[in-house]
Amino acid sequence: MTASSPSLSPTLELACELIRRPSVTPLDADCQALMMRRLEAAGFALEPMRIEEVDNFWARRGGDGPVLCFAGHTDVVPTGPLQAWQHQPFDALIDDQGMLCGRGAADMKGSLASMIVAVERFVADHPEHKGAIAFLITSDEEGPAHHGTKAVVERLAARGERLDWCIVGEPSSTSLVGDVVKNGRRGSLGAKLTIRGVQGHVAYPHLAKNPIHLAAPALAELAAEHWDDGNAFFPPTSFQVSNLNSGTGATNVIPGELTALFNFRFSTESTVEGLQKRVEAILDKHGLDWHVEWALSGLPFLTEPGELLDAVAASIRAVTGRETQPSTSGGTSDGRFIATMGTQVVELGPVNATIHQVNERVLASDLELLTEIYYQTLVRLLA
């Protein structure tokens, strides 16, 4: 079954159209143009924002009152080896198991299609709805994420745009659609650590300083450190060394330098400044000649039970009969940028079992459920 099949629902028809556009990050491949045409027909004011090589758009419909924003990305990760795919990654096929197959089916063109169709239905049913509906869409989520949602949020905040609630279409579900929603994410703080020694001959260690030997006790202490206890919403902060490099390649040379890359995934119980100070104190304690370059990817954010989370949970219950489980696990998402506006943020999307894999796929029927969940959430918040 393909995108041209007359038996496809509006959601699946649009999902297939989006998947068939090969929008490997940071390319958009006219996905946003397709979405904007649909939104313009539904009465949205459109504001394309091309920033550097990244396509973004902001769309808004409605007047004063609370604003519910749908956020997501049109870019997808590379396909990997084409010969490993059962179907070509941009053909958008529904197989005999009822799975919509293709790059972006789960992450996150299926969600984008569900959002658009849900909003079209809601606007048709409630043309004089309360508040406003908005869309914030980027083609820079899977890449560096410098000129996408982050940059758009900065522009919106600078002109005083209001964003009360935001649903991000990331694939949050684990086994069944709606079984898990993300109501927050841990912060991500990375670093490049350089330990300087003195290069020399391995036969004359007294004339050298081996940075590997010097760094090992400090790295062991950092790895064993108890950073915090976490809380009811977040697990304890974790520290992981991801790269360790030293040496000239020769077996008879003591290296002069060691570099280590490490990362914190941290809860709201820790701060950036606090983690940095504790790391630097441990390095000083071991008498190291060190230099560290810090890189903050995002602060932790949390949406506690309230209007948005309650509406999403009630909609999932009404559509699927199941109770959703709020979670803050996993990596970072663009929700971290939107949360800086004081916005309640919830991530809700399809099952994430095959994201970024070859043969990415999602149950076609799950996208129908997701469309209805988005629709019911709109009704609860803005009807």
From Swiss-Prot:
HAMAP family named among the record's database cross-references: DapE
Keyword Transcription regulation among record annotations: no
Alphabetical keyword list: Amino-acid biosynthesis, Cobalt, Diaminopimelate biosynthesis, Hydrolase, Lysine biosynthesis, Metal-binding, Zinc
Record protein name field: Succinyl-diaminopimelate desuccinylase
Catalytic reactions of this protein: N-succinyl-(2S,6S)-2,6-diaminopimelate + H2O = (2S,6S)-2,6-diaminopimelate + succinate
This protein's record includes keyword Hydrolase: yes
Protein family: Belongs to the peptidase M20A family. DapE subfamily.
Binding, Zn(2+) 2: D107, E142, H356
Catalytic residues (positions): D75, E141
Role noted for this protein: Catalyzes the hydrolysis of N-succinyl-L,L-diaminopimelic acid (SDAP), forming succinate and LL-2,6-diaminopimelate (DAP), an intermediate involved in the bacterial biosynthesis of lysine and meso-diaminopimelic acid, an essential component of bacterial cell walls.
Organism: Pseudomonas aeruginosa (strain LESB58)
